[in-house]
Amino acid sequence: MLSVIAVNQNPVANPAAIVTSGYMRFTVLTPEIIRIERSTLKKFEDRASFVVINRNLPVPTFTSAEKDGYLTITTDKLSLRYKIDSNPAVNDPCNPNLQITMNLNGEPVIWYPNKKDPYNLKGTTRTLDNAEGDVRSWLEDGLISRSGWAVIDEQKAR
């Protein structure tokens, strides 16, 4: 017997949770999760992905402000800082144009695009056929990390 669970799918976020700046759209999904998108056509993706099927969540408390050429979005858990009209994919780790600062066990942790995460606990593998030895090198980054942050690339999850 096959049982089916109905899930309310509403991938379009509440407009009150969205902050746009030029080619960028930031969606504050929870105090700990900000969805970051860039589109030179300013056409953003609202379809569900395999990872996220519902983005219409209660809007968390946050503030956003533009000052001195930067957009800042702050929740009680993190602070995002974006250099307005810059491309986050072209980023200098010493002076990132997009960064998120959060607190992990009383210490500040900073994330920026393309930052390597040596403490990611990795995802899963489809099969162990022909596996020999350590299979961790096969695994992509997962949703949990000892670094205090993880990145989900929804472009690859459609």
Locate predicted features.
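Bacterial Sec-dependent signal peptides at the C-terminal "C-region" and cleavage site
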Residues: 2-13
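Short, exposed beta-strand/loop patches in secreted or surface proteins that constitute
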Residues: 8, 17-19, 25-27, 59-66, ...
